Amino acid sequence: MDEFHRCGKEDSFWQQCFLYPLFFQEDLYAISHDHYLDVSSSSRPMEHLSSNDQLSFLTVKRLIGQIRQQNHSIVLFVNCDPNPLADRKKSFYSESVLEALTLVLEVPFSIWSKSSVEGMNECKSFRSIHSIFPFLEDKFPHSNSILDARIPYSIHPEILVRTFRRWIRDAPSLHPLRSVLYDYRNSPENLQRSIIVVPRVNTRFFLFLLNYYVWECESILFSRLKRSSHSRSLSHGSFPQRTHFHRKIKHIIIFSRRNSLKSIWSLKDPKIHYVRYGERPIIAIKGADLLVKKCRYYLLIFRQFYFHLWSEPYRVCSHQLSKNCSSSLGYFLRVRMNPLLVRTKTLDELFIPVLITNEMDPIVPIVPIIGLLATEKFCDISGRPISKLSWTSLTDDDILDRFDQIWRNLFHYYSGSFDRDGLYRIKYILLLSCAKTLACKHKSTIRVVRKELGPELFKKSFSKEREFDSLPFSSKAAARSQRERIWHSDIPQINPLANSWQKIQDLKIENLFDQ
């Protein structure tokens, strides 16, 4: 891959016109063959691996040669081996070809994406989900409305191929991509659809398609929003704080006026802020309702004309931050007013004015999470703890570790909320559910179990809370610990319960608009 990158940088003609010969390089199929075996061996038992899982480069070349002679390249997935025994081998050959196709297409895409990211000095990527919230805390309180825009996964295969043609002029190299997409569209599960739905599976090929599709949408959207923004700038990263005056000068523009020696100093304050996690981009807008309606209309028209795709209205929802809450990343996001008392003393009298500032207030959805716990049989629908009968066959240590891990993950993920009282209600449910599960296993009572285990119940969680409360916020850490929020930098993915609740919220919105 490094060799491909170096060649691509040295000769732009190569990356445009010489991708197709890479399909006939045996080294490429050896790499894809080894990668597929590594992935498949980790996901299936060792007894399913046999010596028949060998790759014939001659067969692969013959398959690629037949691609041009087929309408939809059914030969890619059917009759790819003369042996009638090999349904599994048919899948093996098709996956090997997909791996090779992905490797070839990743070469120019990695070069484009790297060059585009280098041109965006403000764009930053972090591994933790909680890195999004400091950006929201800085930008959301100064915005009026937000647009909750979902990236559509439904797109015609030919439109997807034409987006590649904008960057790759080597038309033969896109024939395998077109054949794979049409073959997937003609599969039994998609016979009733006129468009291809990019599946949410963890194969390298479809993940690459998803990443390219999102990158194509955002690269065009950024340039359009920059042109339409009032200040000619788009915020999609964390700017320096305005309290640092020596950095502040970098973000100031000077406009010279004619017939005057004075200059107008204007701060480059972006009016549009963009942040995305997964398929949920959020656009915060500071302006009148007319500007919000124009942005929403623009997003719908952009998808319709650029991707020839009719986007459902519910996929671009607008919310006023002062009135409504928006659900994202397992939180209810809202902006609340925070009054500040400022004492101003003069020689004659004392003034105590009240300053009102806006502050982002993420709320933990306690009731929906309890409903999800009821679905998983930790409690009933009213929130009363019950025993987890499916775990009674485990050992006591495994039961304790599982309940403890659920609570630690929840407490760790929702540590950014001011109001954590509801979390202790969830802890109470898990604690009694754990005790009832152990009592059901040993055919005893909760009192006996708590007497025998004592502090062993949620021992790790208690230590985690003590560590959380003892963080050095200031000299008055004990008093401020309940009023401070902490965004952690070690959370690579959304909490499972929060993710389940977020999907339920999305389905509710879709059903509301379908009615």
UniProtKB/Swiss-Prot annotation:
Its main location: plastid. InterPro entries: Domain_X, Maturase_MatK, Maturase_MatK_N. The keyword tRNA-binding does not apply. GO terms for molecular function: RNA binding. It is found in: Plastid, Chloroplast. One of its GO terms (biological process) is tRNA processing. GO terms for cellular component: chloroplast. Keywords: Chloroplast, mRNA processing, Plastid, RNA-binding, tRNA processing. It comes from the Eukaryota. The keyword Hydrolase does not apply. Usually encoded in the trnK tRNA gene intron. Probably assists in splicing its own and other chloroplast group II introns. Belongs to the intron maturase 2 family. MatK subfamily. This is Maturase K.
